[in-house]
């Protein structure tokens, strides 16, 4: 059985500003750096052997901090990037026009052909993150990889493993530096292949998540 751990990047400046990131970027906040350190401590205890990260700055920095703690090399994979949010990237959510908010809500509410102008569809996102995950099956026997990616990307990955369509309503919360685990296995009681063991674990973090503070 192959265990793969999934980590969302640490809190960023644009997360705090409620700004749409997509494939644009902003640095980790001091809290985000601390979150990544706490993931690193957990990763060391889990016996992580490989770190594979999105090549965007916020995930690279998160991966670097984790790697320092567990002594792993990092491989960067652009297929783990966040959903391309097109013309809405860098915008604060509260500044969107009614039409622009409609584009964004299509992705949240589950619209099969939803796509922000200039961006990509959820199916395109799903195809590339699943391809990145499949590459883990080529790692040496006994490997225990950790993937560092993004909220929408990882939510789509976990949801589709559970059998939902890529464009399904977004109902899985993966907070900054949450840890999820998926396994590749043959089982008499579960469908063979990828299964979800845990999703969105934040028990290793010692401070409230940003979305809890913004309620």
Curated annotation (Swiss-Prot):
Reactions performed catalytically: (2R)-2-phosphoglycerate = (2R)-3-phosphoglycerate
Pathway field: Carbohydrate degradation; glycolysis; pyruvate from D-glyceraldehyde 3-phosphate: step 3/5
Broad EC category: isomerase
Residues that, per the record, bind substrate: 8-15, 21-22, 58, 60, 82-85, 104-105, 151-152
Enzyme Commission number: 5.4.2.-
Site feature (Transition state stabilizer) residues: 150
Active-site residues (renumbered): 9 (tele-phosphohistidine intermediate), 82 (proton donor/acceptor)
Sections of the chain in a coiled coil: none
SUPFAM superfamilies: Phosphoglycerate mutase-like
GO molecular function, one term: phosphatase activity
GO cellular component: cytoplasm
Alphabetized InterPro entries for the sequence: His_Pase_superF_clade-1, His_PPase_superfam, PG/BPGM_mutase_AS, PGM_Phosphatase, Phosphoglycerate_mutase_GpmB
UniProt-listed HAMAP family: PGAM_GpmB (MF_01040)
Protein family membership: Belongs to the phosphoglycerate mutase family. GpmB subfamily.
NCBIfam families according to UniProt: PRK03482.1
Protein name: Probable phosphoglycerate mutase GpmB
The organism of origin for this protein: Salmonella typhimurium (strain LT2 / SGSC1412 / ATCC 700720)
